[in-house]
Amino acid sequence: MKANQLLKNLVLTELESAVSSYLTKQKIDLPLTEFKIRIEYSRDEKFGDYSSPFALENKNILKLNPKEIAEGVLSEIKNETLFEFVTFSPPGFINFRIRSQFLIQYTNQVMSPMVTFAKTDEKQSILLEFVSANPTGPMNIVSARSAAYGDALANLLLSLGHTVKREFYVNDYGNQVYLLGVAVLLRIFEEKGEKISFQEDESKESVFTLIEKRILPKESYRGEYIRDIAKEVLSNKTKSIQVEEWIQNKNWDECIHDLSKYAVEYNLSRQKEDLKLFGVHFDQFFSERSLHEAGDVENVPTLLKKEDVSTIDGKLHFLSTQYGDDKDRVIRREDGRPTYLMADIAYHFDKYKRGFTKLIDIWGPDHYGYIARLKGAVLSFGKSNDSFLILIAQQVNLIENKEKVKMSKRLGIFQTMRDLLSYLGKNGKDVGRYFFLMRSSDAPLDFDLDLAKDESDKNPVFYIQYAHARICSIFRELQISIADWSIPKVVSGDCFQSEERLRLLFWVARFQEEVYDTATNLEPHRLTNYLQSLSKAFTKFYSHKDNRIKEKQGEEREQLLFLILFTKRAIASGLELLGISSPEKMSKEDESNT
């Protein structure tokens, strides 16, 4: 289906037509583009399904009071097939109630025989890069949030008809990776019975001198996971012999480089395991080292505009202030070594070279200051500003017993993604993903561990899953196979006159536009909010004694089954887009009200 076929856009089309007729009668010679014409959901359902603040937002240009404008537009709305009623409410809203028969026909069209999604007219080839955690240790909680956000976003973009590839950028080159190798070497000494100490204050002593003194540099890594890597090295006979030879010969540099590579591979394999547990798949893990080895990083100055590159005090600078940055950035040091920015520019150029028309990066909260320089580089090598989008997955605060849980990476006292999944148990994937997606990604998130552990319907993800499971239980109790049940050819609006039935029908009919808006705005939390509201509407319907389907016969039973089947499809499809399961059986669904 196309976006203009979405229910709210059908309403918008009628409103635009009515406004056009109204303007003609008023002899106002202005195009529709001069006016703000929009549709929103009614803030109070008693007034209708949709409303428009057209009269309020255009009173100045029309030089009339909102009531007069609204009533004039109302008189031009004639579509009785679509609308049950169209009314005015102060101070200037036009309200629309959709006819139940139209909702039934519309829902049947977009939800049967399978759920369809509205497609964009401007399909793109998108490279979505997310997580990209440093391979210097386990993934932290912010990486888990980024994983949930990025994976859901990829699913939503696919629903619009885009081509989407998921990519994880592996920072396997540079000083931090080297320091990882240093940490592993010191832990190897410790595992062999030697005493090591930890540098607390920085000194001018070289890394090699500190190694010989068995001192772990302050800027290196101290987490317990480093011990695990050291043990892995020592358990590998061939590797252990090679490392011992380097130690005896004090061949520190070669030893550190080798251990760095080994540790990166070890950590990356563990990260991949965690992502798999979280239900996150990547099409490619792209190595930073490969860019250096191919000469792509050294080639960066030739990609940028000549006037955007300058040597200052022996260092090569990208003049990023020309693109809104607060200062120009070094891309090559005096000794010839490239900076991280130089590698990142090479990486993003490579993305475009592979044929992608849209790049979306999801970064952590500590990268805000990096946006202007990299966006500037993309503009400098000739790409449009719209072709590169950077999204931020903000900080996560773990809350337990109403208090924040402390996290610190290098000291080894932080909570990892694996810790969280383990803590949440068998429901870790579903609960974790939902909780990370409940709030806008650009706002800090308080992750309530106690609520996440709660397996009752107080837990928002279980509340939705229980609704789905209850619907499945109704079909089971009636001994009807959902897969084989034939949807009635004719569904009458006569059975949908009660408030609970009408509200549920409307919430189901909204599904496609909710998904479309969620996807186009890149905001998965909108879909979690919708699924909560849909499940709430179903629970209200389910709890009413007049909706006990088992007690109904003939046409009414069939039409109520029609309603709950499409409710089930909306819930299941929505959860699938978020990467969350929709179980058909759960313990609480046995409390049947069939």
Curated annotation (Swiss-Prot):
GO terms for biological process: arginyl-tRNA aminoacylation. It is found in: Cytoplasm. The keyword ATP-binding applies. Its EC number is 6.1.1.19. GO terms for cellular component: cytoplasm. It is an enzyme of class 6 (ligase). One of its GO terms (molecular function) is arginine-tRNA ligase activity. The keyword tRNA-binding does not apply. It catalyses: tRNA(Arg) + L-arginine + ATP = L-arginyl-tRNA(Arg) + AMP + diphosphate. Keywords: Aminoacyl-tRNA synthetase, ATP-binding, Cytoplasm, Ligase, Nucleotide-binding, Protein biosynthesis. SUPFAM superfamilies: Anticodon-binding domain of a subclass of class I aminoacyl-tRNA synthetases (SSF47323), Arginyl-tRNA synthetase (ArgRS), N-terminal 'additional' domain (SSF55190), Nucleotidylyl transferase (SSF52374). A motif ('HIGH' region) lies at residues 133-143. Belongs to the class-I aminoacyl-tRNA synthetase family. PANTHER family: ARGININE--TRNA LIGASE, CYTOPLASMIC, ARGINYL-TRNA SYNTHETASE. Monomer. This is Arginine--tRNA ligase. It comes from Leptospira biflexa serovar Patoc (strain Patoc 1 / ATCC 23582 / Paris). The gene is argS.
